[in-house]
């Protein structure tokens, strides 16, 4: 999932910090996803999908 998130960051020239500020998802949560310390919760996935204008399924492919 984080790979897809990283692709979207690159495509949109955003940083994880910007996404955190814009969505209210804590940077520590994004960092935990990157390191595989925690699983992505559905509500957060929905927020990210809406933010980037993609479907939830995009992250699950």
Features from the language model and the residues they span:
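The alpha-helix within a helix-turn-helix
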Residues: 9, 20, 49
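Phosphate-coordinating loops and pocket residues in cytosolic domains that bind phosphorylated ligands
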Residues: 61
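DNA major-groove recognition helix of helix-turn-helix/homeodomain DNA-binding modules
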Residues: 43-58
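Helix-turn-helix DNA-binding elements, focusing on the entry/boundary residues of the two helices
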Residues: 16, 27, 42-45
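Residues in the helix-turn-helix
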Residues: 18, 29, 58
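A short, Lys/Arg-rich alpha-helix, primarily the initiator
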Residues: 1-15
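Recognition helix of helix-turn-helix/homeodomain-like DNA-binding domains
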Residues: 25-39
